[in-house]
Amino acid sequence: MALSSTNIIKVIVVTDDLEKTVSAYKTLLGTGKEPAEQNTGHKEIRAPFMKYKGADITDTPMKVESVFSDNFWFEIIQPLGNNDPWAAWLKEHGTSICSICLLSDGPLEADEEIMKNAGFDSLFKHEKGYEAYEYFDTSKALGVLVEVKEQYK
């Protein structure tokens, strides 16, 4: 069974030098236009939490900047800690594409079950209260992690 959506909304790049990587992307793509829904007000619907490799965590320190294209954006992350999927990816692969993000059409839990049944474990989950996203360990099969995001309506 396939995921609820194949709508790729962003590509996540990890780097050890945010300014240098962002500059390179902007040189190639320009600054682009931020999607209208990107910075709208958020109403908290669920209680926030974060889990990494099944354990509760409280912080994922990082510097982040987005570079927008016509149909998705690049989220460029420089991890500043060492207890999250971005720091682990950077350590193993260097500056590179870490993951693709698909926008879910339904509850994240349904896509979570599909990924589990396909043999892909949850690596990181962040419930923000107004949206949730989850990273799945698809790196051996796909060469990148897959993030699925649900935005509550």
Residue ranges and their predicted role:
Residues 8-16, 65-75, 89-107:
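Vicinal oxygen chelate
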Residues 9, 98, 132-134, 144:
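Generic beta-strand structural signal
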Residues 3-5, 14-71, 110-140:
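Core segments of cupin and vicinal oxygen chelate
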Residues 85-90, 122:
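A short, polar/proline- and glycine-enriched secondary-structure boundary/capping micro-motif
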Residues 51-53, 79-87:
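Short acidic (Asp/Glu) patches
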